[in-house]
Amino acid sequence: MDKNTDDNKKYDKKRNISDEEIILKIKEEVKKIQPELIEKIRELVSIYSIQTEPEENAPFGKGPAEALDKALEISEKLGFNTVNIDNKIGYAEYVSEEIRDYEEYIGIFGHVDVVPLGEGWKYPPLGGKIENNRIYGRGVLDNKGPILSNLFALHILKKLGIKFDVPVRIVFGANEETGFACVKHYLTKKKAPIFGWTPDCKWPVVYGERGRLKVRIYSEMKDLQKLYEFVNGYILSAPNNGVKLKINFKDDDFGEMILRGYRFGIAENRHFFEFVMSYPAICKKDQLMDLIRSNLTEGTELEEISNWNPVLYDKSSEYVQTLQKVYNYATGFNSEPVTTTGGTYAKIIPNIIAYGPSFPGQKDIAHLPDEWLDLSDLEKITEIYALSLYEISKLKNRK
């Protein structure tokens, strides 16, 4: 990735970050709060917050509820007002006095639940051990560290007296890894934000997420050969862009259709072949289902297993361009907004995008043994989020 030109390095002047004194103070505060931020990440990581059987006041199990309580406790100690919505999701809120009753808001959505520990750890998975300038533990990257980084970034702006024309919420979900039920519940109680992000993906700005449609093609035992012939002819021996199925859609934002996740299996005494379509926004789920059905042979049938529609935010919008310029300014890169095959809270929460925390080249960290977050990266992402919030504060967010 190319570094910024000299002109882009003057982003603070070009993008009207005119108050260099405030920028300097923000960067100084980011450095100052790192020890406390690291300690709070370690506290949150020590809670094993995988989903288990529901208990009283713990709809996703004891761990997620305890982690949510801890995140809200940390927020309160930083001086934020907090709200716990039925122990499923909660938030910390920063509101200027003059807009206390204003309903629209900027929302930053992260999560405090984690995937199971798994085997093969060198470091204690709930220990938050620091070694080689890295903190290790389940959830340090996905997503306890990044959402607390955003909380502390907002705390810095609050401390410096930076005002927003709408409230800003840091939202802590407790069911991201196992179904997004937390944010679905949130939307039954609260309005969607006018803009925001989820720090649960990668840099730079992610303005779009591919759709993800999982299907199965079934056959009875007597038609098993027909299933094998269809799958081999139309999928396994064909390019993985779906051209043989006539679903090889592509667009400028996402590129071409991708077929993946191939699996044979048996369910309810029927054989099936399962696969996933990672599809661009130019096509729709029903269109894909109809086209696949039109190719099926007698004795086979198609069933939808799950679907997440694509997300596509206007990359030319003031919000996206502001965040991208902040990222380039803070990192020295000269990158452009991108799309992803992944899926985040942006699939559910309207008007938000994915924004950080993994830098280019950082892969295969979350969900694996010895999940880690580099402490230098932690400081940098906190700086990016703080500067991003500062820039958002200068926009006209009120509708």
What is each PLM-predicted segment?
Residues 7-135, 164:
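Acidic/His- and Gly-rich active-site-bordering loop/insert found
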Residues 71, 147-157, 186, 349, ...:
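Buried hydrophobic packing segments
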Residues 81-86, 261-264, 303, 338:
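Short beta-strand
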Residues 102-167, 172, 368-371, 375-380:
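Active-site metal-coordination/substrate-binding segment of hydrolases
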Residues 112-114, 171-179, 200-203, 359:
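Acidic, glycine-rich active-site loops and adjacent beta-strand->loop/helix elements
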Residues 176-290:
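Midchain, well-structured core segments that form catalytic/ion-binding scaffolds
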Residues 225-254, 301-399:
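An extended, acidic, His-containing surface patch that forms the Zn2+-binding/catalytic region
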